[in-house]
């Protein structure tokens, strides 16, 4: 899938913007790996630290 840079609010201040693969619903930035697509309109910010 295509990679889209999205803003995840408060986290952006510390971690910057995240690249999210819309097709696979997984994004990676630094040491964070997301198991859900995170959008500004979402309240859920589920992630796992490697």
Swiss-Prot record:
InterPro entries for this protein: Cystatin_sf (IPR046350), Monellin (IPR015283), Monellin_B (IPR002095), Sweet-Taste_Mod_sf (IPR053768)
Positions bearing the site annotation: Blocking, abolishes the sweet taste: 41
Domain of life, per lineage: Eukaryota
Use case: Natural monellin has not been mass marketed to the food industry, primarily due to the challenge of large-scale purification of the protein which is relatively sensitive to heat or acid treatment.
Transmembrane segments: none
Keyword presence, Transmembrane helix: no
Keyword NAD: no
Keywords assigned: Taste-modifying protein
Gene3D superfamilies (alphabetical): 6.10.140.2000
Any Pfam family the entry gives: Monellin
Quaternary state and interactors: Heterodimer of an A chain and a B chain.
Function: Taste-modifying protein; intensely sweet-tasting protein.
Protein name (Swiss-Prot/TrEMBL): Monellin chain B
Originating species: Dioscoreophyllum cumminsii (Serendipity berry)
């Amino acid at each position: 899938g295509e990679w889209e840079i999205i803003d995840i609010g408060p986290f952006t201040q510390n971690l910057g913007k995240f690249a999210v693969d819309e097709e696979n619903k997984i994004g990676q930035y630094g040491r964070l790996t997301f198991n859900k697509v995170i959008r500004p309109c979402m309240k859920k910010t589920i992630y796992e630290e490697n």
